[in-house]
From Swiss-Prot:
It is found in: Cytoplasm. Residues 1-61 form the TGS domain. Keywords: Aminoacyl-tRNA synthetase, ATP-binding, Cytoplasm, Ligase, Metal-binding, Nucleotide-binding, Protein biosynthesis, RNA-binding, tRNA-binding, Zinc. It holds the Pfam family TGS. CDD domains: TGS_ThrRS, ThrRS_anticodon, ThrRS_core. It comes from Porphyromonas gingivalis (strain ATCC BAA-308 / W83). Belongs to the class-II aminoacyl-tRNA synthetase family. This is Threonine--tRNA ligase. Binds 1 zinc ion per subunit. The lineage of its organism: Bacteria, Pseudomonadati, Bacteroidota, Bacteroidia, Bacteroidales. Catalyzes the attachment of threonine to tRNA(Thr) in a two-step reaction: L-threonine is first activated by ATP to form Thr-AMP and then transferred to the acceptor end of tRNA(Thr). Also edits incorrectly charged L-seryl-tRNA(Thr). The keyword Nucleotide-binding applies. One of its GO terms (biological process) is threonyl-tRNA aminoacylation. Disulfide bonds: none annotated. PROSITE patterns: AA_TRNA_LIGASE_II, TGS.
Length: 653
């Protein structure tokens, strides 16, 4: 008998060779119907894979990320099976599950192309194959046999992948007449897949290398129920309306120019207003929490990034070194701000009394993203991080972690991100050799993160083995208005850079000690955060943040002078106002400015100019009546002050 322990600490004994499917059935028929994969000692397994020794087991359903991953991974294989039947001789690259669905990179063959118009036929074949409920079979085979199998099919992409694997056992999965190289896990059979939609076709270079062949990437989504697919497609339509690229253009927030370069956004005046207000917002909070603002160059000596290890990590994703007239001197566009902050820390000797030291910077960094990976503001080549690095004593770690969490909570509340969750990434329970830093420091850091979450009442999922080699971390995932998950805000403990840069402080014992370093970026990057904020709010930003709070609309040209006088009076009270004095009918002006998401419209005509008043319309609410200019100004000032005081109160308590 073997002992199976469940997440709640309870356990049961089973015969050796039991499977996740059998365990689910022993608990309840409904669970067996819903379960998609099994977690066995921290690894995700197929449901029919045998468990032969004591294990910690967790059963994953659709609502679990691991369940969706297995479902969508099997859907990618189902698509590949359909493609192989429809396009004999097709070759396969990789076909993973992704955050929302799956894709497969394929090579249809010389002179053959797969277009969007072909997707319905592929979809239909997938549905037919799914209806057969083909069993998905996992096999372990020798590397030589795998090379021979895929070599006989002349599938050079799979042969290349297999050749790079270590000698030993290779895992394949078979369903019907289709076999693929894969680690898994997968569903028990194709019949679980009830609803399928292939979404788009794109190009993708083999292994992300622009010098290699461009393959055809087919994206899809699938669900266990048709109703789920219908809801998802409705969500997609709403997401298209909220696309930050579309709204950013409509609101004149940012743009791109091929003359400047792909992936290098240009912030237009209205977008710059928005971004600067976000930066000022965070600077105010950071000032309260004792941060010091710093500025570092956009470039650094290549040796700096060799010391930090970033050159080895980002070398392939960086722009080429900048050579100077001096022989042997090379500079790099900055891929990260942390090496520069380490150098700032080193400039001045520090005592234990000086710590913690908190250095903050809105620092622009550069990484070369392939053209096919660029996407609006979410994937760019130059972006600004709201970076800060804290240098503290080990005994200060928990307190500093809590304070950073407070900053993130204030930001989420102020910007109406009400639904968020967290993940704590800790070391592997068994394999500890790859981690830098002492056992004592790691235990202290991991305990500090867990206790900080408990003290703040933050529910957090603990993931073992997900920590970076240099320290544990806490990631925040927010749900936007459409229910999509975005990673915003990371707090990372680092024992690596203090070692690499030989950072030290003098302790109470008069000896030299290494500080603990904490990386944190609540926004992540300004570009990506603004993109998420646009899509979350559909461009209807909070009144304190929006670039233009008010627009004045004269009903005809003869009231332009009065409209500009109203705007001047509001401007003098720091209210952000524009005048729309185009020679258009007022109805057209109202419609146009509603599309610009400007919160308040002030309509001025004969009566308003004579009485020194304005007719007020509020975005989404309509007519608010006629007011004196000063009355309206006081109204908008109070609305803004109430918003700002709400989040100021959070950090001043």
């Amino acid at each position: 008998m073997i002992k199976i322990t469940f997440p709640d600490g309870n356990f049961r004994e089973y015969e050796a060779g039991i499977t996740g499917w059998d365990i689910a059935g022993s608990i309840s028929p409904r669970l067996q119907q819903d379960v998609l994969a099994a977690g066995v000692n921290g690894q995700v397994w197929d449901l029919h894979r045998q468990i032969n020794e004591d294990a910690e087991v967790k059963l994953f359903k659709w609502d679990d990320a691991e369940g969706k991953h297995a479902f969508w991974h099997s859907s990618a294989h189902l698509m590949a099976e359909a493609l192989e039947e429809l396009y004999p001789g097709i070759k396969f690259g990789i076909g993973p599950a992704i955050e929302n669905g799956f894709y497969y990179d394929v090579d249809p063959g010389e002179g053959i192309s797969i277009k969007d118009a072909d997707l319905p036929a592929i979809e239909k074949r997938m549905q037919d194959l799914a209806a057969r409920k083909e069993t998905i079979i996992r096999r372990d085979i020798a590397k030589a046999d795998a090379l021979r199998m895929f070599g006989d099919k002349d599938d050079q992409y799979k042969v290349e992948l297999i050749s790079e694997l270590a000698d030993g056992t290779i895992t394949t999965y078979t369903q019907g007449g289709f076999t693929d190289l894969c680690r898994g896990p997968h569903l028990p059979n194709t019949g679980y897949i009830k609803a399928i939609k292939l979404l788009s076709v794109a190009g993708a270079y083999w292994r992300g290398d622009e010098k290699r062949k461009q393959l055809t990437r087919i994206y899809g989504i699938s669900f266990p129920k048709k109703k789920m697919l219908d809801e998802y497609l409705e969500l997609l339509e709403e997401a298209k309306k909220r696309d930050h690229r579309k709204i950013g253009k409509e609101l004149e927030l940012f743009a791109f120019s091929q003359n400047v370069g792909a992936g290098l956004p240009l912030w237009l005046p209205r977008g710059t207003q928005l971004r600067l207000r976000l930066e000022d917002f965070l600077k105010q909070i950071q000032k309260h929490f004792g941060y010091q603002q710093v500025i570092t160059p956009h470039i650094g000596n290549k040796n700096l990034y060799i010391t930090s290890g970033h050159y080895a990590k980002y070398g392939q994703d960086s722009f080429r070194p900048i050579n100077t007239p001096q022989e042997g001197e090379e500079f790099m566009l900055k891929p990260m701000n942390c090496p520069h902050h380490c150098e700032i820390f080193k400039i001045t000797p520090h005592s234990y009394r000086d710590l913690p030291i908190r250095l903050a910077e809105f620092g622009t960094v550069y990484r070369y993203e392939q053209s096919g990976e660029l996407h609006g503001l979410t994937r760019v080549r130059g972006f600004t991080q709201d970076d800060a690095h804290l240098f503290c004593r080990p005994d200060q770690l928990k307190e500093e972690f809590c304070k950073v969490m407070d900053i993130i909570f204030i930001i989420f509340k102020a910007l109406d991100f009400k639904n968020f969750e967290a993940q704590i990434s800790l070391r592997d329970k068994v394999n500890r050799e790859k981690y830098i830093g002492s056992e004592e420091n790691w235990e202290r850091a991991e305990r500090a993160i867990i206790e900080a979450c408990e003290e703040k009442g933050l529910p957090a999922v603990i993931e073992y083995g997900e920590a970076a080699f240099y320290g544990p971390k806490l990631d925040f995932m927010v749900k936007d208005a459409l229910g999509r998950r975005w990673q915003l805000g990371t707090i990372q403990v680092d024992y690596n850079l203090p070692e690499r840069f030989d950072l030290e402080y003098t302790g109470e014992d008069n000896k030299k000690h290494r500080p603990v370093m904490i990386h944190r970026a609540p926004f992540g990057s300004m570009e990506r955060f603004v993109a998420v904020l646009i899509e979350h709010t559909a461009g209807k930003f909070p009144l304190w943040l929006t670039p233009d709070q008010v627009v004045v609309l004269p009903v005809s040209e003869r009231f332009n002078e009065y409209a500009h006088r109203v705007a001047k009076e509001l401007n003098q009270r720091d209210i952000r106002v524009q005048v729309d004095d185009r020679n258009e009918k007022v109805g057209r002006k109202i419609r146009d400015n509603e599309l610009k998401r400007i919160p308040y419209m002030l309509i001025v005509g004969e009566n308003e100019s004579r009485e020194e008043e304005v007719s007020v319309r509020k975005q989404g609410e309509g007519d608010m009546g006629i007011m004196k200019i000063t009355t309206f100004a006081e109204l908008i000032e109070k609305e803004v002050d109430d918003m700002i005081s709400a989040w100021r109160k959070d950090y001043q308590n």
